[in-house]
Design a protein with these regions (language model features):
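NTP-dependent small-molecule kinase module
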Residues: 140-214
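Glycine-rich phosphate-binding loop used to anchor ATP phosphates in small-molecule kinases
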Residues: 54, 58-124
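Walker A/P-loop
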Residues: 20
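A glycine- and Lys/Arg-enriched "phosphate-lid" helix/loop adjacent to the NTP-binding pocket
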Residues: 92-165
Length: 214
């Protein structure tokens, strides 16, 4: 189990919201350890070409990799952790959205959520979740800028649906502590004040954890 004074921070947000960039910046600043979303999922290219056929395979692979990350975090040494996307997003955003769109069958979705529930009942939530909230135009701009081939044909309506799921999850489902960064107005790369805002919240969280441990 992790030391009680060590921060585990989840960084959440849609495709192109800047999760990986923020994870890198915070990891360097805090001398922390980063856990990144696996971009080499062997199903991801097939999924973007045929979502109905490959949705369950894609999500189960991500869930498996997230389970491994969680186990690694629980066994980690005395170092802060920043996690690029959380297991909760896999379920409440992506799997749920695919099911709502008719791209994942009810049977597959129920199987997925059953496994997800077993796992999340055994592991703690992040100490703080940083949600990078971004409009679809902002996401598309970022996606095009980074130029990943398998993302070039991503559907705008699909991104819009994901944003709706994110908003519902943050407002109505997630029970942990959340810091929302509005990526349309708050650029933590270009504006140092935004990064200082994030770090000030993290520093307060550290103080809370250290006080609770005493």
């Amino acid at each position: 189990m992790k030391d009680g004074s060590i921060m585990v921070i989840g960084i959440a947000g849609g495709t192109g919201s800047g999760k990986t960039t923020l994870t890198e910046m915070l990891t360097e600043r805090y001398g922390a350890k980063a856990y990144y979303e696996q971009s080499d999922n062997p199903y991801i290219g097939d999924f973007y070409n045929d979502m109905n056929r490959w949705s369950f395979n894609l999500q189960m692979y991500f869930l498996g990799s997230r389970i491994q990350q969680t186990m690694d975090i629980l066994r980690s040494g005395p170092v802060d952790i920043f996690q690029d996307r959380t297991v909760y997003e896999d379920a409440y955003i992506f799997a749920d959205n695919l099911h709502r769109m008719g791209l994942m069958s009810g049977r597959d979705f129920d199987t997925y959520m059953s496994i997800f529930g077993l796992i999340t009942n055994l592991v703690p939530r992040p100490d703080l979740l940083i949600y990078l909230k971004a409009s679809v135009p902002t996401l598309i701009s970022q996606i095009r800028r980074r130029g990943r081939a398998y993302e070039m044909n991503i559907d705008e309506q699909y991104l819009r649906r994901l944003n709706d799921r994110y908003d519902d999850w943050i407002e109505n489902i997630y029970r942990g502590e959340v810091l929302v960064i509005d990526k349309d107005r708050e650029d933590f790369v270009a504006d140092a004040a935004v990064m200082e805002k994030i770090c000030a919240r993290l520093d307060r969280k550290r103080e809370e954890l250290e006080t609770a441990k005493k």
